[in-house]
Amino acid sequence: MVRVRIPATSANLGPGFDCLGMALSLYNVVQIEAADSFQIALKGDYTAGIPGDETNLVWQSMCNLWEAIGFEIPTVSLELENNIPPTRGMGSSSAAIVGGLVAANEYAGGVLSKQQILQIANRIEGHPDNVAPALLGGVTLAVTAEASVIARTVHSQPQFMALAIVPDFYLSTEKSRNVLPASISRADAVYNLSRTALLVEALIHENHELLKEGMQDRLHQNQRAGLVPGLGETLQVALDSGAYGSALSGSGPTILALVSSHRAEQVSQAMVDSLAAHGLTAKAYLLSVDSEGAAVI
C-alpha cells in the first residue's frame, strides 16, 4: 500500500502570473493498493462531482506515468481523500495530478526523481505554477524552457500565515482564462516584471513591508474582477485590515491574504464581510506554507 499527501496551492501569486506558486497546509490524500478488481473510494470534504471511474484525474495521471516508464498497469483500489475545494483556485487539479504521479512512481519502485515527475505533471496540467509547489513545497518559481520546466524553491517556509477566503461558487480555469486579453501593454508588462522581482526579494529576505507592493498585479486580477463580485474591494479591505499583501488565488474565486497570526482573525472577518456585502458567502481557511510538498506518508 502507498499513501501520498498533497498540498493545496495558490498560483499566479501576486504578479507572478503562470510562474509563482505557494504550497498550503490543506491536503488531499491518495492511497493505492493491489486489489482483485479496480475500484475508487471517495472521502473527505469535497467528493461531489469527482469521478469514481477510469476518467478520474488521479487514475489517469497514474496510468500516464506507468506508460512512460513501461510499467504494466496493475489492478488496484484507490482511496481518494479530497479536502481541497475544487474549481476554486486552490490547485485541486494539480493535487490530483501530482498525487497520482507520486503514488504511481512509489508503487512502481520510485524510479523517477521529483524533477522527472515535474516534467510529466507539467505536460498534463499545461502550466507549472501549481504543480511545482504541489510537488516541491514552499513558494516556487517555475518557468518552461523549450520542452522542460525549471523550478526552484524561493522560500520553503516563510514566516507568515496564508488566509484563503473561499467563496461558495465554482469558477473553472477555462472560463477565467477566457476573459484575459490576447496582448498587454508594455507598461503593464514592466509593472508586473518589476513587482515579481520585488516579491521574490521580499520572500527571500522575509521583508514583509515589501509584500503589499510586491503582490500587486495588472495582468489578470482586474480582468477577472467581473467574475468575482467585490474582488477589488476585498483585496483592499484585506490590506486596510492589516494583511501584508493580498491577491486573487490562481484563477479564482478564492482570495488570498498574507497575514501575521495575531491579525488573521480581523483580516478574515473583514474579507468575509466584504464579500457578503456583494451577496457572497465564503469560508475562511487559515493556513501555513507547506514546506514539504507531495510526500509519501
Curated annotation (Swiss-Prot):
Source organism, top-level taxon: Bacteria
Catalytic activity entry: L-homoserine + ATP = O-phospho-L-homoserine + ADP + H(+)
Keywords: Amino-acid biosynthesis, ATP-binding, Cytoplasm, Kinase, Nucleotide-binding, Threonine biosynthesis, Transferase
Leader peptide range in chain numbering: none
A GO cellular component entry from the record: cytoplasm
Pathway annotation from the record: Amino-acid biosynthesis; L-threonine biosynthesis; L-threonine from L-aspartate: step 4/5
Broad enzyme group: transferase
Cystine crosslinks: none
Residues reported in the UniProt entry to bind ATP: P85, P86, T87, R88, G89, M90, G91, S92, S93, S94, A95
GO annotation (BP), single: threonine biosynthetic process
Protein localization: Cytoplasm
Pfam families on file: GHMP_kinases_C, GHMP_kinases_N
InterPro entries: GHMP_kinase_C_dom (IPR013750), GHMP_kinase_C_sf (IPR036554), GHMP_kinase_N_dom (IPR006204), GHMP_knse_ATP-bd_CS (IPR006203), Homoserine_kinase (IPR000870), Ribosomal_Su5_D2-typ_SF (IPR020568), Ribsml_uS5_D2-typ_fold_subgr (IPR014721)
Main location: cytoplasm
Record EC number: 2.7.1.39
Record SUPFAM superfamilies: GHMP Kinase, C-terminal domain (SSF55060), Ribosomal protein S5 domain 2-like (SSF54211)
GO molecular function, one term: ATP binding
Family note: Belongs to the GHMP kinase family. Homoserine kinase subfamily.
Free-text function comment from the UniProt entry: Catalyzes the ATP-dependent phosphorylation of L-homoserine to L-homoserine phosphate.
Annotated HAMAP family: Homoser_kinase
The protein's name in its UniProt record: Homoserine kinase
Organism: Desulfitobacterium hafniense (strain Y51)
